[in-house]
Amino acid sequence: MAARLLAFLILLAMVPTAIAEDGSVMRIDHSFTLMEYDPGIEDAAIHPASNWVVVVGAEGYAVSMDKSSPSTMIPLADISDSDLLDSDYHPGGNTALIVGENGSVLRYAISDHSLERATSAQSVGYDTMQTVSWNANGEWAYLGSSEGTLYRMRPAGNGSSEIVPMPGTGGSAISSIDCLPDPFVCLVASAEEGIGMIDRDHVLSWIGGSSSTWSDIVCRSGGVPVCIAISMDRSIAEIEFESGVVGLDIQTLDGFSGTPRSISLTSSEQILITATPAEIIEHRPSGDGTFTWLTNEAIVGQSFGVSGSTITGGWDGDSGDHWIITRDGTVALLVPEETGVAQGLPKLVTMLSFGIMGVMAIGIWSTRSSR
């Protein structure tokens, strides 16, 4: 690890990236608020082919924002008074599914910024649907609930949807789902059963990590495919795939005082972990370290309405910029630290490894659907 850190510092000296004394590589440039009252923002979904960010929150709050100029926004139809908790774009980028409390499953269309019910609440048992993710080819979406139910769903024509319950959750709350194109699998983070994997035949298998309560998971398909899960007890799981063998490695953050809340992927495939109190760190898989990105010290010092809330979403802007949104509706632009500021070093967050916690051989490689 010392050799890796030395190599990183040498590389750092060769590139124009500036780093503040507190270890941040980004700073807040400006911010604005969505409204006078707290909209309870829970999620922001973006697609590389779309210019619109879908933002959802409490009591049916839903807007579509221009990703480069989010003050340009379109309120979506008020068709639900339930809290909306998660959203995901179809791989085609033209529609997105939104899920929430009381069996809420909505469909957003970019073409006319319409919002409609994608299926009845009864079809998902009126459960609190807290996560949704499309598989890589867009044939099926997987929906998970806080009650421990898991469904797969696809359009069935005439505005209706086919809903199929999936067994094997053990009744554990499903916190998050994300999918890969190759291997053609989806990974599931749960509160009690650990981390699971859905194969191309829609079979759920648990691969390990049941000692932690996993809150979020993200998969990166570029380069070597990997999925990263986080838990509020500061555990980080890396799921890797090699020749049909799935490996699960769990580590813990030791030099970090925040509570990880969510994990996301930027357009440049940086893996960012958002924590409370408000802070963002960057995780680099395969033992390459976890580093400060925007520290809580910087957020408190710069304020802009971010420090007293929880960061609940983010997306890339232009030319290395990054937008974040907080639960209380503050939208802030992050920009790279300027060359010439007082130089510090990115802080390396210590990772204590628990070793390989689970390995399973399964025929998953190159299993894209023929449809």
Positions of PLM-derived features:
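Sec-dependent signal peptide recognition
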Residues: A2-F8
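Transmembrane helix-bundle segments that form internal channels/tunnels in multi-pass membrane proteins
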Residues: L9-L11, F32
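Residue-level hotspots at or immediately adjacent to binding/recognition sites across diverse folds
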Residues: A20-R371
